[in-house]
C-alpha cells in the first residue's frame, strides 16, 4: 500500500499504533513520501478526525484492515484511530473504500519471512459481508481492485469539480 500512497499526491495518512508496529516489522516505516501528511495514533480522542467535520475530506481509504478492525467497524465500536476515523467518515457522509485482509476462505499473505497460508474464520468472512452492506462504503477484495477503485474515485472527483 505504501507505493500506492506515494503515487497519490496530496493525501493525509492516519497510522494506528498497530499499523506502525507492522510497518516496522516489514521494514517499511521510513518509505512514505515526505509529501504525505502523516497523523499518528497518539491521543485517546484522535483530535485529527476533526477534519472530517470541517469538510476537508471527500474519501477515506482504509487499507489494509485487520479482522479485528473490520469487526469493530461493523458493530460500531470506535475505540481506536482506525475505527474512530471510519465512524466519523460515516457520520459526515465521506465516501469510504475499505480493503479488509480476510476476504476469502483461503488466502496467501505476505509475512515478514515470506508468503504464508491463512484461513480466515467464518465470523471474519461474515463481517466482511456485513461491511459490504454499509452505505457509501465500497469493500474491495484485492489490492488490484483497491487501486482501480481509488483511480475511479479520483476520476469521478475530477469530473465533479469541473
Locate predicted features.
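A cross-family phosphate/adenosyl-ligand binding-site feature
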Residues: 1-162
Amino acid at each position: 500500500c505504501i507505493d500506492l500512497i506515494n503515487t497519490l499526491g496530496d493525501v493525509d495518512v492516519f497510522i494506528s499504533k498497530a499499523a506502525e508496529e507492522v510497518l516496522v516489522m516489514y521494514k517499511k516505516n521510513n518509505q512514505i513520501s515526505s509529501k504525505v501528511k502523516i497523523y499518528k495514533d497518539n491521543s485517546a480522542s484522535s483530535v485529527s478526525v476533526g477534519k472530517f467535520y470541517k469538510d476537508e475530506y471527500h474519501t477515506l481509504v482504509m487499507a489494509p484492515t485487520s479482522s479485528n478492525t473490520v469487526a469493530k467497524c461493523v458493530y460500531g465500536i470506535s475505540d481506536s484511530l482506525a475505527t474512530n476515523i471510519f465512524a466519523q467518515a460515516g457520520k459526515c457522509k465521506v465516501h469510504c473504500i475499505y480493503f479488509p485482509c480476510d476476504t476469502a476462505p483461503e488466502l496467501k499473505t505476505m509475512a515478514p519471512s515470506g508468503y504464508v497460508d491463512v484461513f480466515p474464520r467464518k465470523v471474519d468472512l461474515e463481517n466482511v459481508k456485513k461491511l459490504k452492506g454499509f452505505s457509501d462504503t465500497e469493500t474491495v477484495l484485492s489490492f488490484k481492485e483497491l487501486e482501480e477503485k481509488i483511480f475511479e474515485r479520483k476520476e469521478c472527483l475530477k469530473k465533479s469539480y469541473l
